[in-house]
Every structure is written in C-alpha cells, then in structure tokens.
C-alpha cells in the first residue's frame, strides 16, 4: 500500500471518529477511485470540483426559496430588523472570506490538508461543527495579509 492511500485511510478514520460524514464520504470516494484505477479523473476534479461543490451548496441553500418555503414578503422584513441586517452584513463578509479562501487554496494545496486536519480535529476533540475548509481558508487568508511573508 502506498503512502497516499495510508494518508487517505487516516483521514477517513479521523472523519469517522469525528462523526464528519462529509469528510468520510469524500475520502472514501477518493480511495475508491484509486482502487478502481480512476486516477485519470483527478485532474478534472482538481480543476472543477470546488466550483461544482459551491454550485451544489448554493442550490441547497436556495431550495427553500424555490420551493416556496420562504415567501417574498420575508425579503421585506430583512430591512426592518437589525438582526436580519446584521445577518446580511455577516453573510457578505463570509462570502468575501470564502473568495479569499478559494484563491489561497488554489495557490497552496498544502494549506488544504492543514485546514482539513484542523477541521477534523476541531470536530473530533472540541465538539465543533465542520464549517468547511473554504471558510477556514478565507479566515487564514485574512489573517495572513497582516503578517510578514
């Protein structure tokens, strides 16, 4: 067994121990692809996987609107409640951070592994919630801009 498979198995174990289904499923799929000699598709996943994942996530977030569970009058209430206005501002800031995270992750794949391990450790040992490496990368990019290179 090669080192990459061993590392993936360790990540799979951490995902299972940490009760992180997203990481567990993703790593299991990658391991399965390696076992079935489907590595030729890895460049395609590297190039388009993040964008495809964001599209699927966005569809999931917008489904309540499309299904009618969120009615149009709710949008007017956003501008009459300071909690909702703050939610809009925080949403904008997090989207900004995610954009910075996307750039950082594409420029330095090693950071992705560190963020993934940190997320798994946070879920496993601190009862955290996996908010995703993308936002973590955005926060890291935000912090790094203030530190010497």
Swiss-Prot record:
User: Where found, per UniProt?
Assistant: Cell membrane
Judging by the UniProt lineage, the source's domain of life is: Bacteria
Q: Which UniProt keywords apply?
A: Cell membrane, Membrane, Transmembrane, Transmembrane helix
UniProt KW Cell membrane keyword: yes
From the record, give the transmembrane residue ranges: 3-23, 48-68, 85-105, 106-126, 128-148
Q: How does it sit in the membrane?
A: Multi-pass membrane protein
Q: Which Gene Ontology CC terms are recorded?
A: plasma membrane
The text of the family note is: Belongs to the UPF0756 family.
Please state what the protein is called. UPF0756 membrane protein BBR47_32760
The record lists the lineage as: Bacteria, Bacillati, Bacillota, Bacilli, Bacillales
